[in-house]
A protein has these predicted regions:
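A sequence-level detector for short glycine-anchored, His/Arg-bearing signature motifs
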Residues: 1-2
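An N-terminal structural lobe/cap that precedes and organizes the functional/catalytic core
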Residues: 8-10
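Residues at the C-termini of beta-strands that transition into short coil/loop
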Residues: 13
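C-terminal catalytic or substrate-handling cores of phosphate/nucleotide-
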Residues: 16-180
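C-terminal accessory/interaction regions of large nucleic acid-associated machines
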Residues: 165-264
Length: 264
């Protein structure tokens, strides 16, 4: 029998308390109320979940948490969805620096998750974000085989905020990429959304064209992604550069343009 205050009793109590405390901490994390929890039954999230049912290979929770593990599907993280949408539609600074704010603040939330947002547009923008991730991974995997230009591209993509900045810049360049006026950027979608990996490859072809000019975007992230004016100016500079070489890249851009629903 252990006496009160004995070293053995103290050891036994500590041994029991440690895993118990871990269980409590894990439960507290799981039970933490997130802004997305409070929006999960919002009419827009309910509608978007329904729209995603057309694509059984894709999964969008709309902020609703489920203990069931999703398997063999492309999972769309709701916070990353909101970030990429906000960046694509003009505010990569808030998208990068305040991702929870998008779900928390009514104004930011309703600007993104409105009646005009569709599952197809989410797929369009989210696949761009994934293409940037994979483009960066491909550069990393080249290791010593990277060219000097590729080293510079990897250095750019490794900077804080570069992904959201690049998404915003691509959006600014969309008219030049498609060769036509865009009346409503919220209606930009792929014609066929069944193969997500193929859509990512479509975007990679665009990154192959734009990334060599990444230096035009550098001033916007030299001290972190902080200035909306700086990001807008940098994106416009990239657009001007692309436009000046548009005839040179016309054939290279045509497959991407053909894959987009131009009924806008």
């Amino acid at each position: 029998m252990c006496k009160i205050g004995s070293p053995l009793l103290s050891f036994l109590l500590c041994s029991l308390c440690t895993p118990l405390q871990e269980i409590i901490n894990n439960n507290n994390k799981q039970n933490e109320i997130l802004p997305s929890d409070l929006r999960s039954n919002d009419k827009q999230q309910v509608r978007l979940r329904k729209e995603f049912e057309k694509y059984p290979q894709l999964y969008y929770s709309g902020g609703r948490r489920d203990s069931t593990r999703v398997r063999n599907k492309e999972v769309f993280d709701p916070y990353l969805v909101a970030q990429t949408l906000l960046a694509f539609h003009g505010d990569c600074v808030t998208a990068y620096n305040s991702k929870k704010l998008i779900w928390d603040e009514d104004k930011e939330y309703t600007n993104i998750f409105s009646d005009q947002l569709t599952a197809e547009h989410i797929i369009f923008v989210y696949s761009l974000g994934r293409a940037i991730d994979e483009f960066k991974i491909n550069l990393k995997n080249k290791k010593e085989q990277r060219t000097d230009i590729e080293d510079d591209e990897l250095n750019f993509l490794s900077k804080r905020g570069s992904k959201m900045l690049l998404i915003s810049a691509v959006s600014t360049c969309m008219e030049s990429l498609l060769g036509k006026k865009i009346l409503d950027s919220w209606r930009l979608v792929f014609k066929d959304n069944k193969n997500f990996d193929k859509l990512v490859e479509e975007w990679k072809a665009i990154l192959d064209v734009l990334m060599p000019w990444h230096s035009t975007l550098e001033p916007a992230i030299v001290s972190g992604l902080k200035s909306k004016e700086a990001t807008q100016n940098a994106a416009k500079q990239l657009r001007a550069t692309l436009t000046s070489f548009s005839s040179m890249y016309a054939q290279q851009l045509k497959p991407f343009s053909d894959s987009i629903n131009t009924d806008m």
